[in-house]
Amino acid sequence: MVVEDTPKSIITDDQITTNPNRVIEDDNNLEEGEILDEDDSSATSKPVVHQPHLLENSWTFLFDTPAAKSKQDDWGSSMRPIYTFSTVEEFWSIYNNIHHPGKLAVRADFYCFKHKIEPKWEDPICANGGKWTANYPKGKSDTSWLYTLLAMIGEQFDHGDEICGAVVKVRGRAEKISIWTKNASNEAAQVSIGKQWKEFLDYNETMGFIFHDDARKLDRNAKNKYVV
């Protein structure tokens, strides 16, 4: 598949760098009167060891396919984990080798959640939470999805401990990106997350926050409790 050009990321290039230190022979090893020539082939160098850049949290990509969902009665039972990553390098290795939202089939759901948190209302960490949602025309969410991932795994939110994960849902005429949080009743934290997310995405439309409990009881009739 063709990998899209990666836009300027929140995880900066200097976080993925090589070790500039080059080990050469110590001056004490020179013969008396010998001058060390830096280009001298006798100057030995050791291979550079690339240290992985650890993330503060481990994250898991999960995928729910349209075909699998049509065969299951219970919501979420067809969801499958793809890969759990804990370093910057692992993230890019996965991201650059998977389809982005614009290439996913209609009715596909693609998740990135903190490791061991399931993107389900029944998960004890998600149970009292809610979600912010940004809406996009079909095929227009790729860049915002990447920026959302980078903001989360790069711990760019002031209330990052409130975040469970994010999901992009591909539908017939639209794509929706949502950020799930833990404590819906913590208005200050939720509004802060919503405002920062809008800023990261340069999103100009209104965003709404729905409590999971309302969505569970009212389904499509659930109303926004917070807006930014």
UniProtKB/Swiss-Prot annotation:
Entry's Gene Ontology molecular function annotations: RNA 7-methylguanosine cap binding; RNA binding; translation initiation factor activity
The name this protein goes by in its record: Eukaryotic translation initiation factor 4E-1
Effect of L62W: In strain: JI 2009, alleles SBM1 and susceptible. In strain: Dark skinned Perfection. In strain: Brutus
Entry comment on modification after translation: According to the redox status, the Cys-126-Cys-164 disulfide bridge may have a role in regulating protein function by affecting its ability to bind capped mRNA.
Known function: Component of the protein complex eIF4F, which is involved in the recognition of the mRNA cap, ATP-dependent unwinding of 5'-terminal secondary structure and recruitment of mRNA to the ribosome. Recognizes and binds the 7-methylguanosine-containing mRNA cap during an early step in the initiation of protein synthesis and facilitates ribosome binding by inducing the unwinding of the mRNAs secondary structures. Key component of recessive resistance to potyviruses. (Microbial infection) Susceptibility host factor required for viral infection by recruiting viral RNAs to the host ribosomal complex via an interaction with viral genome-linked protein (VPg). Also seems to be involved in virus movement from cell-to-cell.
PROSITE patterns for the chain: IF4E
GO biological process: defense response to virus; regulation of translation; translational initiation
The gene coding this protein: eIF4E
Family assignment from sequence similarity: Belongs to the eukaryotic initiation factor 4E family.
Effect annotated for changing S178E: Susceptibility to pea seed-borne mosaic virus (PSbMV) and altered translation activation
